[in-house]
């Protein structure tokens, strides 16, 4: 459960560190806006942070910037090989600029947000494996 013991729904930004995730590696180095909407989104990580393949982090460690109270302000982790992603924020709810609570004025003409890359990367990975 979230540390707040309630359902959290908010728009905030994530940092995408260097990573080997099939879906998120091409977004490394970005800060992107995204929706959070869950009551049970807390990552409880008993080991030290270096033991996990962290692929997305909330920009802040404390509430409300880390709305669920996840250890190490983790928003997403991945398997060592990069194939399996576990992510609490909803990137599928931030694909189009009109879905975002805030989007840069100079990018308002975009048809899609950078989050679409995650799904394009997954599709390309599957297509490559099907050859």
Where are these regions (language model features)?
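Amide-donor transfer/coupling interface in amidating biosynthetic enzymes
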Residues: 1-131
């Amino acid at each position: 459960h979230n540390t707040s013991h309630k359902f959290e729904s908010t728009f905030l930004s994530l940092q995408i560190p260097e990573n080997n995730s099939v879906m998120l590696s091409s977004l490394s180095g970005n800060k992107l806006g995204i929706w959070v909407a869950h009551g049970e989104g807390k990552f409880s990580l008993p080991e030290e942070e270096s033991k996990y393949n962290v692929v997305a982090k909330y920009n802040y460690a404390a509430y409300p910037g880390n709305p669920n109270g996840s250890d190490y302000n983790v928003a997403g982790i991945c398997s060592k090989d990069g194939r399996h992603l576990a992510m609490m924020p909803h990137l599928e709810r931030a694909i189009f600029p009109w879905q975002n609570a805030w989007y840069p004025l100079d990018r308002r003409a975009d048809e899609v947000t950078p989050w679409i890359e995650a799904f394009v990367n997954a599709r390309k990975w599957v297509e490559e494996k099907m050859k």
